[in-house]
């Protein structure tokens, strides 16, 4: 799976590089069943459904069937439960719950956009925003959130969540509590 932020697509390939599925419309941004606006991550759920973090401009998660048929979207820009600023990374834990790395504002730049693509207020840091990992059930319903880390990327292995932050650190979290089990400093940002 690949996400193409600026091409507004998510693609599934075989290990040999054969394209199997394209979600979104290349080069066309939007916020509907067939368009993304800066997708950032993708997860295949335990039931085979596909969840895309449409993160940079639309601030939503989008569900598709294994064949690529649109199911629904969850979220909008905001700081509430199952609302997002920038859903930048996405993973699922061993129980199928979704974890969303939600970055605060200031991640957008005027040169990255075309007129009408993004609201002007979204290009500035939000001083009241809290970086967080939101935990949702498999359908996208809010469970809780962890705010003690500034997440940039996420991965799940066993009963642990690996979260890299914007300070080039890696935190290994307990998937049930979100508590930091260990930390590795000055490591690559993306995992």
Give the role of each language-model region.
Residues 1-191:
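Eukaryotic scaffold repeat domains enriched in small/polar residues
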